[in-house]
Amino acid sequence: MSITKEFDTITAISTPLGEGAIGIVRLSGTDALAIAQSVFKGKNLEQVASHTINYGHIINPKTGTIIDEVMVSVMLAPKTFTRENVVEINTHGGIAVTNEILQLLIRQGARMAEPGEFTKRAFLNGRVDLTQAEAVMDIIRAKTDKAMTIAVKQLDGSLSQLINDTRQEILNTLAQVEVNIDYPEYDDVEEMTTALLREKTQEFQSLLESLLRTAKRGKILREGLSTAIIGRPNVGKSSLLNNLLREDKAIVTDIAGTTRDVIEEYVNIKGVPLKLVDTAGIRETDDLVEQIGVERSKKALQEADLVLLVLNASEKLTDQDRALLNLSQDSNRIILLNKTDLEQKIELEQLPDDYIPISVLTNQNINLIEDRINQLFFDNAGLVEQDATYLSNARHISLIEKAVQSLEAVNDGLALGMPVDLLQVDLTRTWEILGEITGDAAPDELITQLFSQFCLGK
């Protein structure tokens, strides 16, 4: 997609393909009303009031054949998502009918929209900035209510406001430095001394570092915790997965080696999305298929944010158990002693003190797993403070880290006694980096790449 503004009219199906109660085909652009009217039998859409819903039929203009009975929403620029004329045709849900209407609109002069092009136009037309555009996709992808809360707040402009206010303060500081350099005799502007610049720079740095401290929590809530369930065969890993999911997704049998691959599922644990990875039991095996599963399990363990190590409390520790304890000791790990409903034989004195005795069969202490996760990753604090602004996007986090580094360079220069005017470069770089977050200074290639990740029709 070109970054220059385009004024042709685009169209796409905005609802998931498949059967459903309603399907929506969207148009945006100067000719949206005229194109929609050319296939609509009902009120004249070019004459109806903005933000109205109009009953009628979509027809094939060449044959007069009725395609579907519809409700058509008409929204006139600039009070629309794209700030262009927007028409949304609400059809009966179904692949055939929505595709037929889409093809009619294209034949009448609309262009098939590219992924994310409606939101891209909202960005190019000043309706949203880049952080708000990204928040749209975060809302769509949110797996828990906490993740959605963060995304909605970002869409509302909380992060944008904070970044823009900081950029303005940096710009004011740069302007003050420039005035001091170009007009040293101008007494109405406070002199930007080394001490004053250090104070301002530290203030900027403190604010950005405070924002960075929200990144761990925000990123977890946005992307989820990659959680590997490990243990030797037949200790209850798949049963634990099913218990957490509240449904049977993994194959549970008494035969060692029945989980031959890595099974991934998402589950909501008190607002935290866990990407649960049920791994094949890690053991030595001659079975080629199972060997592949074991290797994938080891890889999943290395990449996991959280490890749930399941041991069988009704049996003594084996060499495989001890190997897994060693293998996972440097991970964020929760040790689970399963099958406590049976006679206990495991040697507790050989285990770390922080294990949790559970019974997947009777549901004993499963809730303690959730509490331990909160303790490990959130220091027992609440997951989301209602009025707080969170960093959750990896791109934003990386740019804030770079901005902090630029401010550190300013402070280092001040400590070395460098003149204030020579430190403008790093301060200007900080201002530019923060502009990349909101899109004010983002490269065209980045903007194109970001919007290409959106779904069609959004």
From Swiss-Prot:
GO biological process, one term: tRNA wobble uridine modification
Residues binding (6S)-5-formyl-5,6,7,8-tetrahydrofolate, per UniProt: 26, 88, 127, 458
Pfam families according to UniProt: MMR_HSR1, MnmE_helical, TrmE_N
EC nos: 3.6.-.-
GO-annotated molecular function: GTP binding; GTPase activity; metal ion binding
InterPro entries to which the protein is assigned, alphabetical: G_TrmE, GTP-bd, GTP-bd_TrmE_N, GTPase_MnmE, MnmE_dom2, MnmE_helical, P-loop_NTPase, Small_GTP-bd
Enzyme class: hydrolase
Annotated binding of K(+), by residue: 234, 253, 255, 258
Protein keywords: Cytoplasm, GTP-binding, Hydrolase, Magnesium, Metal-binding, Nucleotide-binding, Potassium, tRNA processing
Record-annotated TrmE-type G domain positions: 224-378
Co-factor binding comment: Binds 1 potassium ion per subunit.
Binding-site list for Mg(2+): 238, 259
UniProt keyword annotation of tRNA processing present: yes
GO CC annotations on file: cytosol
Lineage: superkingdom: Bacteria
Cofactor(s) needed: K(+)
Signal peptide as annotated in the record: none
Subcellular locations according to the entry: Cytoplasm
Residues binding GTP, per UniProt: 234-239, 253-259, 278-281
Family: Belongs to the TRAFAC class TrmE-Era-EngA-EngB-Septin-like GTPase superfamily. TrmE GTPase family.
Subunit relationships: Homodimer. Heterotetramer of two MnmE and two MnmG subunits.
Record function comment: Exhibits a very high intrinsic GTPase hydrolysis rate. Involved in the addition of a carboxymethylaminomethyl (cmnm) group at the wobble position (U34) of certain tRNAs, forming tRNA-cmnm(5)s(2)U34.
Protein name: tRNA modification GTPase MnmE
The gene coding this protein: mnmE
